[in-house]
């Protein structure tokens, strides 16, 4: 037996017991004739004491222990004279009588502490060391608890967990696939699934009316803080349901997770907002509702007064930051530079302060009378001490997106984006299609299997761009944590959808014939939803990136710097797969 207890287990009630512990040396320090060692394992830290007066040889051996040595000790639990109430074991220490060094260690390249001195790159290269840090371990423990609660909740609702294949056919619609060459079928390739979408629909055709799976998915796309090339979905599908049934079931699951994992009771129904309203008032289909600053459109008030920036604009809109009139000129200039950054793209920003006497002082006073500025103030319901920030531009959608970024930045600066406050809502009634400038055609906003709203089906023939989808996203604190839709279960409607998306009948049959054929054998009405497990965990843990809740993540270039992957294959492997590498140089 290597240990009788863990390093986070012993308490004052255990005083006098002989115990054996094993773990890693967090730190060792010599003070006079005593040596103190903090021993760490997954469960906590326990202080060890070596007394030179009692056993000089043992104490000398302890003096040679380095950081991250793996040791086993036996000793007696003793009450500490200088208690550390910041840790659960802080009232006791172990007077060591036996020390075994199980493994020595070279000095790690960064400190194994919550506030480590290691940067992102070095910690990812030595991820196995980074995982020893308490804060990282807690994220993975939270992830484990979440998957347990997900399974418990869905099992209680009659869902079956069914695994679907990892090697599937490629469907180029949407994000890029990761492809896998087949040795046994030269010149042919599998793809890693972007989601189990069509497979779970086939399970509905098969009669498995409530399916779920906690599943790895893969997308070869550009990365950012909330994306990884491989990620985990809580994937679910239900038969004989309408949108309201699905929303009710998975809102219930969200409330269950909040209660069990965060101790937060969400008794009220989640807010609902149409996609059109989300864009109109927040410039985003995933609005952060922890704070206000709803957009106000100012076209009728601000156009036609000789200020060409506004007079030539297709959209003028603003936000009102309560109590922020004290912003200095320097702060306002910094906000202007913020919105002018290339990734945001605004040309500038107009601001106006509401003074103590109710008058409005703006950066464009010479173009506007106080009467017009008062109309603007009333449009915002602004009060003395408030700050109004305005953007304009030739493209309404782009300008709203810029205003969204400004709103989020001001909310951050004012401390309104509290990570311990949760604002949940459903965004519904998405457009069925969106226009792709790159492709020169309509694309499915979600995927080709989304059912249009019944009342909009006639528009498929006359005005497909106006069709709304039976689709819904759950948004928490400005993060899309999940989304889904009612699916098409009629092969004729599915064929119509492929036609609008530019598929020839031959291409539709080649890529999705298996699904179209299945529908001919009696497909039930069905729909579903997929939650992003990584996003849920990072939200509950208060993280800025999903990378911190994944055991072995990729960096922003999609590389695993620890495994040095991806990497070139040996020529023998390429020959076996009948592959030739021909890298085209960028022109």
Swiss-Prot record:
Organism encoding this protein: Phocaeicola vulgatus (strain ATCC 8482 / DSM 1447 / JCM 5826 / CCUG 4940 / NBRC 14291 / NCTC 11154)
Residues that, per the record, bind ATP: 219-221, 228, 480, 532-535
Listed name of the protein: Aspartate--tRNA ligase
Gene3D superfamilies: Bira Bifunctional Protein, Domain 2, GAD-like domain, Nucleic acid-binding proteins
Keyword terms of this UniProt record: Aminoacyl-tRNA synthetase, ATP-binding, Cytoplasm, Ligase, Nucleotide-binding, Protein biosynthesis
Oligomer status and interactors: Homodimer.
Chain positions recorded as L-aspartate binding sites: 173, 219, 446, 487
GO biological process: aspartyl-tRNA aminoacylation
Region (Aspartate): 197-200
GO molecular function: aspartate-tRNA ligase activity; ATP binding; nucleic acid binding
Localization terms from the record: Cytoplasm
CDD domains (UniProt xref): AspRS_core (cd00777), EcAspRS_like_N (cd04317)
Xref: PANTHER family: ASPARTATE--TRNA LIGASE, MITOCHONDRIAL, ASPARTYL/LYSYL-TRNA SYNTHETASE
Family: Belongs to the class-II aminoacyl-tRNA synthetase family. Type 1 subfamily.
Chief site of localization: cytoplasm
Enzyme class: ligase
A Gene Ontology term for the protein's cellular component: cytoplasm
EC code: 6.1.1.12
One Pfam family this sequence matches: tRNA-synt_2
Alphabetized PROSITE patterns for the sequence: AA_TRNA_LIGASE_II
